[in-house]
Amino acid sequence: MHEGKITQIIGPVVDVDFVDGQLPSIMDALIVERPDGTELVLETQQHLGEERVRTIAMEATEGLVRGMKVVNTKNPIQTPVGENVLGRMLNVVGKPIDGLGEVHATKTYSIHRPSPAFDELSTKAEMFETGIKVIDLLEPYSRGGKTGLFGGAGVGKTVLIMELINNIAKQQSGYSVFAGVGERTREGNDLWEEMKESGVIDKTALVFGQMNEPPGARARVALTALSIAEYFRDEENRDVLLFVDNIFRFTQAGSEVSALLGRMPSAVGYQPTLATEMGALQERIVSTKKGSITSVQAIYVPADDLTDPAPATTFTHLDATTVLSRSIAELGIYPAVDPLDSTSRILDPNIIGRDHYDTAQAVKQILQRYKDLQDIIAILGMDELSDEDKLLVARARKVQRFLSQPFFVAEQFTGLEGKYVRLEDTIKAFKEIIEGRHDSLPENAFYLVGTIEDAIKKAKQLQNA
C-alpha cells in the first residue's frame, strides 16, 4: 500500500507528497480518510518533480489539513455497472445518494476508458421518433447519434430534455442513463420523483454532480454516467439512451480548476485543453456493431452567444442540433425551437424519405420568407404586401404556431394535456397547412395543440365561444 501525505490545499486542488518516490499514475484515484471516518477521493492530475503530485478533489476539501495520510488505490475512479445500478442514484465516485443502501454490483468500470476502435463503429443512419413535432419534422434525431439542445438561460432546455426522457423512455423499452452535471438540485429531485411516479425509474440509472458540488465532481460525473452506458452497450449489446444536462458545466468545471493546475488560460478564459477534454468525452459516445448509445445533451449558451468557445467546440461533435431561441420563447411558442437555426445530418431524402424531406424544406422556405418580410411589415404594415405574400404570411404564422406543442412534463404549468404526435401525422398536417387546406381556420387554433385534428376541434370551440 503506497501512502503519501497532504502538503498543500488550494480550494479543490490538493498537493500530495510520496516520499518513497513511487508516484501514482495520472488519473489514479487517491483516498484520504477524514477524522470522522468518511473517505474523500482525489484524482491525480500532474506530477510535480520526483515526489509530489497535484490532484483534484471529488468532494469539498473542508476539514483537510497538511500532513494527512493519503492512500494510492493504483486505479482510476471505479463506478458500479450493470443491472443493479438501474433505479438508483449515484454520485461521481459511484456511491449511492438515494438513501436506499449499497449498490450490490458484480462489476465495476473505470470512468476513464478508451473510445471504441474505428473498425468497431456502426455507420447505419436511422431516424428515431421523439413525438415532438418540430424535432421530428425539421431536425430528426438519429438512433445512435449525438444531439445537442442549445439555449441560453431560461428558454426551456431542461423541460425539453425531461419531455424527451418521458416520451422516449416510455415509448422505447430500452435502458436510459441520466447525467446531471452542474445543474439545479431541485430539478434533479423533480426528475427522480417524476420517474418514480411514471414507472420509468426501473430502467434508468441516474448520476448526479450538481451545482453545489466542487469542480472535480462536475468535471467527472459525465464520465461516470458514460461508463455505465458503455457497459450496457458493450457487455449486454443493448441500445442505450444517455441524457446529459448540462454539458457546458463539464467545460465550466474544467476551466475553474485549470488556472489552479497552472495552465495558461485560452480564449475567453477557458482551459487550453478544452477541445481535448470534450473530444475524449464525445468520442466515447458512439454506436458500435454490438449496440448503440443515443445521446441528448443540453448545452447552455453563455449570453446567448453561439460563437462562445464552449458551445462552439461541442457543435463539431453533434449529428443534430436543436437551437432554442429567446425571441421564439418571447412569442410564447414552446418548445422555443428555432426551426431555421436547428440542423440534422439525417435530413436527407435517402434516409428519411422524399415526402418527409420535401415537407421539411417547404416549412423552412415559408418560415424563411416570412422572416425576410418581417422588416417590411414592421415599417409599412401588412397592407403594403402583395396578395401572394399576405397569403404566405398567414400560412407561415399558422406553421409557426403549429410548431408549438403541449408537453406531458409541463401539464401542471400549462393546464393542457401533453401530446405525443406520430411522425406520419406531423408530416400530413404541415403538408396540408402549406397547401392551404386550412386557410379558413384562425391562427389561434394552431397554438399549443397536438395533431391537425386537435386544431380543427379547437377552431370549432373558438367559433362557438
Curated annotation (Swiss-Prot):
Q: What is its EC number?
A: 7.1.2.2
**PROSITE patterns according to UniProt:** ATPASE_ALPHA_BETA (PS00152)
Indicate which residues the UniProt annotation says bind ATP: G151, G152, A153, G154, V155, G156, K157, T158
Q: Which UniProt keywords apply?
A: ATP synthesis, ATP-binding, Cell inner membrane, Cell membrane, CF(1), Hydrogen ion transport, Ion transport, Membrane, Nucleotide-binding, Translocase, Transport
Give the catalytic activity: ATP + H2O + 4 H(+)(in) = ADP + phosphate + 5 H(+)(out)
Tell me the InterPro entries matching this sequence: AAA+_ATPase (IPR003593), ATP-synt_VA_C (IPR055190), ATP_synth_F1_bsu (IPR005722), ATPase_a/bsu_AS (IPR020003), ATPase_alpha/beta_chains (IPR050053), ATPase_F1/V1/A1_a/bsu_N (IPR004100), ATPase_F1/V1/A1_a/bsu_N_sf (IPR036121), ATPase_F1/V1/A1_a/bsu_nucl-bd (IPR000194)
Per UniProt, subcellular location reads as:
Cell inner membrane
Cite the GO molecular-function annotations of the record: ATP binding; ATP hydrolysis activity; proton-transporting ATP synthase activity, rotational mechanism
Assembly with partners or alone: F-type ATPases have 2 components, CF(1) - the catalytic core - and CF(0) - the membrane proton channel. CF(1) has five subunits: alpha(3), beta(3), gamma(1), delta(1), epsilon(1). CF(0) has four main subunits: a(1), b(1), b'(1) and c(9-12).
How is this protein named in the record? ATP synthase subunit beta
